[in-house]
């Protein structure tokens, strides 16, 4: 039997047992190390050059029926080996096999379709969970069926075509995996990358090209063999002892004596940062998650939670040639810190001739651009909603709701139901003393009205889609629910919190019994990679899919593809040759002497045979013989649910689902 996700957590991933594995609130912890690397393999600060991810080019362009062009992109999610620590290779999951994945750059109004191919192993090579994926373009007002809904899963050898209209103002977005209950481990394994949306306004006032630099910051711990270690401290969070920027430990970047623009993404799955310069000088924040701020903000440090993006200008003209300026991490009280987690990367000022062409080379801007989000007034709100984020019986909740409740309701239960174009105030309270929660609201940009009754901090006075809700803090947010009707998620972006089960949903412009044409799971289904979906328009040009990157910077972290492991043999069934079911479990719960519920999906190739899929459930709890629990048929959409009251008299802790059309999956069972 394969190792289940929760079993992997119990043994600390790949042999790394956390010293702080109690579910108690954190204040601040300092420790020597988390990794088990030999000293010769432990990376040291400032030994590597900053890698810059490749820029992905479209594989073709078509013309939509209305005459607008649409660029078609393709990415493969695949396993690879990365050169991160000295002398050893690290297995990763990556978009096109790189860590982080390629950057996508588009102009406002350019439509794209992104074909996301899942060619990952069937199960995670280290942690044993099934590698079904769901891709979320974080920061995009996408239709629900293209938003990366947690249960909109794409199995191995399948793909999904995501449509992005890119009508919003310029901003730094990122795309990452959002698969239910496994987002943290998949993002930690490498499924994350930046996505830049440009427009004429930012293009005329901010540095561009090689002076517009993505910095994807994350942290990790490593086993002795160089593989990633994973310990989420009883679902509280993971804090590694190695800081990575664009996949490299504590890198160095050579800079000219001019202004640079840095797009800083916190891609850590739990760690927060408080960035500052070693010189103590101020930096200029010009954009937040949702784009340009109304006015630039000068700060010497700022608090940066998971998934937040800040665009920061640093003026290196004030420093002499040969000066090293370090980007430091002053940290926050909710972290576990180690010897070198106070360092992030370094900039070395060179005597290279200064390129002053293009905007923003010499003058720091003050006034930037108004936005509809920041122009909203609290008086426009038609409703105020209040919700708390907290831990309850070892499960993280938001507004008193868990994601399991959403699934159990058939995706109907919602935390809020604003009408289309409604303006509302959401008040989010975190009364805990030791956990912070970076709360992400899909679809919308919002304005932070207040934090504990005071004005928002200087660095967050721009349009946001993630809000840092610190210990003992209450924030008030103002937002307009526009663009699309449908269901969208709200969750904590401390990903172990999200995975255990701090996620809910809201609906926009839907009544309870409405037929939803934009259903996030049912409207657009994945299809086999070999059966590509037809293009929407007519072919115009088909350039080769190449990548570009500035020659002045280092290549991305070296990766080597790893062959996907073979799928398990299908059970005997009358199935057309070459076709096989992909069965997934999305909910598994057995409350002893109360009830038992399992639900999931059947993704039989082509989906037309979904109604012929029958799923058999087995109790495979370790220490006793396997027992058949029951049988359930998938519906026409491939969904299935099995319930029993009160259920078996012995606690089920591990369950296996097996399809008569081939394919099995094993997972742990929630007992509360």
List PLM regions with ranges.
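Extended terminal and domain-junction accessory segments
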Residues: 10, 18, 22-74, 78, ...
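Exposed aromatic-hydrophobic patches
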Residues: 161-164, 311-315, 476-479, 639-646
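Surface-exposed, short loops/turns at beta-strand junctions within beta-sandwich domains
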Residues: 168-169, 318-321, 483-484, 645-651
């Amino acid at each position: 039997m394969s190792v289940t996700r929760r079993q992997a957590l119990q043994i600390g991933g790949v042999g790394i047992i956390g010293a702080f594995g109690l579910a108690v609130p954190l204040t601040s912890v300092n420790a020597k190390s988390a990794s088990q690397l030999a000293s010769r393999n432990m990376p040291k600060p400032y030994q590597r050059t900053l890698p810059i991810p490749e820029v992905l080019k479209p594989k073709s362009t078509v013309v939509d029926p209305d005459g607008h062009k649409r660029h078609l992109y393709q990415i493969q999610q695949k396993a690879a080996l990365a050169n991160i620590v000295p002398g050893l290779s690290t297995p990763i999951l990556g978009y096109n096999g790189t860590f982080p994945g390629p950057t996508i750059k588009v102009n406002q109004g350019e439509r794209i379709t992104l074909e996301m191919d899942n060619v990952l192993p069937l199960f995670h090579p280290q942690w044993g969970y099934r590698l079904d994926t769901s891709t979320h373009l974080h920061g995009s007002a996408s239709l629900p069926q293209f938003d990366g809904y947690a249960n909109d899963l794409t199995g191995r050898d399948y793909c999904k075509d995501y449509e992005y209209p890119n009508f919003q103002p310029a901003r730094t977005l990122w795309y990452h995996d959002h698969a239910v209950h496994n987002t943290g481990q998949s993002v930690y394994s490498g499924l994350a990358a930046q996505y830049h949306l440009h427009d004429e306004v930012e293009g005329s006032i901010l540095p561009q090209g090689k002076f517009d630099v993505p910095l994807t910051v994350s942290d990790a711990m490593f086993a002795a063999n160089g593989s990633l270690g994973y310990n989420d401290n009883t679902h509280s969070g993971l804090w590694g002892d190695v800081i990575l920027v664009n996949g490299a430990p504590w890198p160095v970047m050579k800079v000219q004596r001019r202004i640079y623009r840095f797009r800083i993404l916190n891609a850590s799955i739990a760690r927060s940062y408080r960035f500052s310069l070693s010189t103590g000088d101020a930096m200029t924040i010009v954009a937040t998650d949702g784009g340009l701020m109304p006015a630039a903000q000068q700060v010497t440090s700022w608090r940066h939670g998971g998934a937040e993006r800040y665009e920061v200008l640093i003026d290196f003209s004030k420093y002499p040639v040969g000066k090293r300026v370090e980007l430091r991490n002053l940290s926050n009280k909710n972290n576990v810190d180690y010897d070198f987690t106070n360092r992030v990367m370094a900039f070395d000022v060179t005597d290279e001739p200064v390129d002053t062409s293009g905007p923003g080379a010499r003058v720091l801007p003050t006034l930037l651009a108004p936005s509809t989000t920041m122009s909203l007034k609290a008086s426009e709100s038609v409703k105020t909603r209040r919700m708390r984020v907290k831990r309850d019986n070892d499960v993280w909740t938001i507004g008193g709701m868990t994601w399991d409740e959403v699934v159990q309701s058939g995706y109907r239960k919602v935390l809020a139901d604003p009408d289309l174009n409604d303006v509302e105030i959401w008040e989010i309270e975190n009364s805990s003393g030791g956990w912070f929660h970076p709360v992400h609201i899909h679809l919308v940009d919002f304005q932070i009205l207040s934090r504990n009754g005071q004005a928002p901090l200087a660095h967050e006075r721009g349009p946001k889609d993630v809000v840092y809700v610190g210990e003992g803090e209450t924030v008030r947010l103002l937002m307009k629910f526009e663009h699309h009707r449908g269901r969208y998620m709200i969750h904590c972006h401390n990903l172990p919190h999200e995975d255990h089960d701090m996620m809910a949903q809201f609906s926009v412009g839907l009544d309870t019994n409405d037929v939803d044409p934009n259903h996030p799971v049912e409207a657009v289904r994945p299809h086999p990679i070999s059966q590509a979906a037809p293009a929407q328009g007519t072919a115009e040009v088909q350039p080769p899919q190449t990548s570009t990157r500035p020659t002045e910077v280092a290549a991305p972290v070296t990766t080597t593809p790893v062959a996907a492991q073979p799928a398990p043999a299908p059970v005997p069934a009358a199935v057309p040759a070459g076709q096989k079911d992909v069965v997934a479990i999305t909910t598994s719960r057995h409350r002893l002497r109360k009830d038992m519920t399992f639900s999931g999906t059947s993704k039989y190739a082509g989906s037309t045979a979904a109604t012929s899929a029958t799923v058999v459930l087995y109790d495979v709890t370790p220490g006793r013989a396997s027992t058949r629990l029951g049988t359930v048929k998938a519906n026409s959409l491939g969904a299935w649910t099995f319930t029993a009251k009160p259920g078996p008299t012995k606690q089920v802790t591990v369950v296996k689902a097996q399809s008569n059309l081939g394919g099995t999956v094993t997972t742990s069972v929630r007992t509360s």
